[in-house]
Amino acid sequence: MDSLQTAQMVSLSAELGSNNLELAEPEEPGTSAAAGQSAAHPEEVTPEGSQALGAQEPEQSLPLAVPTPLECKVLLTQADALASEGHLREALEVYRQLSERQQLVAEQLEQLVRCLADSVPQEELASDSSGTSSCCAAALKEAGEAAAVAPEVWDGFKCKKCHGFLSDPVSLWCGHTFCKLCLERGRAADRRCALCGVKLSALMAASGRARGPRRAGQPAPLQLRVNVVLSGLLGKLFPGPARASQLRHEGNRLFREHQVEAALLKYNEAVRLAPNDHLLYSNRSQIYFTLESHEDALHDAEIACKLRPMGFKAHFRKAQALATLGKVKEALKEFLYCVSLDGKNKSARSEAQRENLELPHCSNQEGAAAAEESSSLANSAQGKVSSKEDRKKDQEGEDRDAASVRTGKCQEKKRNRCQIETQEDTELPNKVSKQDFPAEQGAKPDLSNPLGSFDASDLECSLCMRLFYEPVTTPCGHTFCLKCLERCLDHNAKCPLCKDVLLQCLPSRKYSKNVILEELIATFLPEEFKERKRLYEEEMEELSNLNKNVPIFVCTMAYPTVPCPLHIFEPCYRLMIRRCIETGTRQFGMCLGDPVKGFVEYGCILEIRNVQFFSDGRSVVDSIGKRRFKVLHQGQRDGYNTADIEYIEDQKVQGDDCAELMGLHNCVYEQASSWFHSLKASLKNRILNHFGPMPEKDEDPQVNPNGPAWCWWTLAVLPLESRAQLPFLAMRSLKDRLNGIRRILAFISRNQN
C-alpha cells in the first residue's frame, strides 16, 4: 500500500464522523500506576465510561452514520496496513472504530493477531511464559519438591519428535534416534525423520528393512528394531523415566480408545516416577480438560510451561484451560504466545482471533485492561528491531487425538463464565524464570551423578572390544564401530551378531554415525574418547604412508599414465581399496605375482579415480598408473600384501646423447603409430575402448621422470606376455626402452608380412 492510498483512507475514516480516541502513551520506565490508569494521564480513564482503550473522549462527537460495506472495508484495509507496518497502537484504534460500525468476525482479526504475536519478544517467551497464579502455587510447589530429588535426564536421551524420554529407542539409518511409537504414528507414506526430513520409507529401503507382503500400490511395512545398546543403557541409568515413558505411551493408547480415567491413572504413576518430564504434565492437562476438570488442567499446563517455556502444546493447553475458565485476557496472551511459537498453526491463530472478539463481550473494566495489555504488546513491538530473529518451531509430536482442541465446547463455557470482575484488575504476577524451578526447592541435580554409574565397558564394540568410534547402528538394532562393520560386510553381508541380512547396505556404502551415542561418549567419557581417537589417527597415519607398508595388489602389469580398470571381489582387497580412499591417498601398488616370492620386485603405483559398488559388495575400480617403484621389503596387513618401496625414475642425458635420443624418440614414435593404424578396425576399437587413444609425441621426451606417455601406451597394447613387459618397467634408461620397443615392432612387422 503506497502513501497516497493510506492518506486517502485516513481522510475517508475522518469523514465518517467516527469517535476517534487517542491511545494512552506508554509508561515511563520505573513508574507505577493502577490498572487501567496512567500516571502521566490520570484523566484518560473514567470509571463509568465505556472506553475500551482508556483514552479521553472528545467533548463533542458527531452522530454515527449507518456505515456502508465499502466504508467498513476501507477501515479494515487501513487497520491491516497499519498493523503490517508495525504501527500497532494506531491499528488497534482503527480496529476499535471498525467494531463500533459492524460486528467483527474472527477472520477479520487475522492480521492483527499475526502482528501481535510477532511483537512478543523471545526473551519474554523464555522467561515470562509460565506465570504462577495463586491457584497453581500448590501444584508448582508439590512438583518442585519431587523434581528436586529426581535425577536430571540428559537432553540427548530425549526423543526429538515428542521431546519426552526415549522409550524403545529406534536408531534410523540416517543416525537419528526416536521413540518407536513416535515413528509408527501417522500414515506410513508421510513418516519422516523429524531432524533431517528424510522419509522413513527411503531410509528403510536403503537399509533393507522395508520388506514383507503388501498389496499393490501400498508402501512396504516398516520394520523398526530397538537399539539394543541404547535401550539397555537407558534402563540401567534411568529406570524411573524409562518406566514413565512406557506408561505415557500406554496412557496415550488408552486415551485414543476413550478410556480417559484409565489413561489418567497411567499418567499419575508416570508423573510420580518422572516429575521433571514436561510432556507428562502437558498430556495430563489435556486429560483433565477432557474430564472437565479445568482447574487441574490449568495446574498441569502451568507446570509444563515452567519446565519447557518454548513448548507449543503446553502454552496451547494452558490457553485452552484459561479460555474455558473465562479468563479472556490471560487466554488471549497465551494464544498469542502459541502463534509466536508456530505461526503456521491454524488452531492457535483462530483461537487468538476469537479471543480478540470476546474482549468487548466481557465487562468494561476487563475489556479496558485487556486492551491495555494489547497496547503494551504494541509498545514493545515498536521498540524492537525490524529484522527479528527467526522463530524456533517447537511442535511436540504427541498424538493428535490427545492434542485435539474442543473449540466449540471451550467457547460456550467461556461465554457463560465471562463476568464483571469486582476487584481492581492488576497486572499478572511476575513470572519466575526457568532456573527457579525446581531449583528453588533444592539444588539442581548434577547431571554426572546418574551417568556416573556406567563406564566405557558399557559402550564397547562387540567386534574390536574397544570403545565405540564412529558408532553405526544397523537396521536390526545392533551397534558397531564404522570400520569394524565395514570389514565384516567385506566377508559377509549379514549382521555379525544376529545374522540379519544387510545386503542393501552395500551398494551405497553410506553409513551415518549414531548421533546420540557419539555425543554421549564425547560428553561423558572425554578421556577414553580422546585415547580412542588417538589410536585411530595413528592407524590412519600409518596407512597413508606411501613409502612404508604400501598396500600391494598382486594381479597384473600396470604402467604410468595408462588406465587400469580392476574388478574387486576378494574381501581383503575390498578392505584395501576402502582404506586407500579413507586415508585420502587413493593410491596402492600393482605387481605381478611370483610363485616363489609372492610378487615381483618391480611395480607401478595406481591412483583410484572412481569406484562403482554393486549390491553384493563387489566393485569396479577405475585407476590409472602414476609412478614406478622397486620393492625393498615385503609384508602383510589384514590379509593383503604390503611392501616398503623406493621410487625409480629415468636417468637424463645431455649434449650429443640428448640429440641422439631425440632422433630415436621421433623414429620409434612414427614406427609405433604406423603399426597401430595398420591393425584391423575391430582390434583398434577394442584397444581404444580399453586404453584410450595413443598419446601425442612429447617435444621433450625427458620432461617426465617416467618417460613419454606414448611409450607406456605402446607397451600396454603390444601382444607381449607380462613377463616380457616387466623388464621395461625396471629400465631407468629411456634410450634402452625405445630400442626395445623398436625391436619388438620390427619383429611383429616381419611376422605380419
Curated annotation (Swiss-Prot):
Keywords: Metal-binding, Repeat, TPR repeat, Zinc, Zinc-finger. Disulfide bonds: none annotated. It comes from the Eukaryota. Residues 540-749 form the Lon N-terminal domain. A zinc finger (RING-type) spans 159-197, 461-499. Coiled coil: none annotated. Residues 363-382 have a biased composition (Low complexity). Residues 17-57, 351-450 are annotated as: Disordered. Residues 386-413 have a biased composition (Basic and acidic residues). GO terms for molecular function: zinc ion binding. TPR repeats lie at residues 72-105, 244-277, 279-311, 313-345. One of its GO terms (cellular component) is cytoplasm. The keyword Repeat applies. This is LON peptidase N-terminal domain and RING finger protein 3. It comes from Mus musculus.
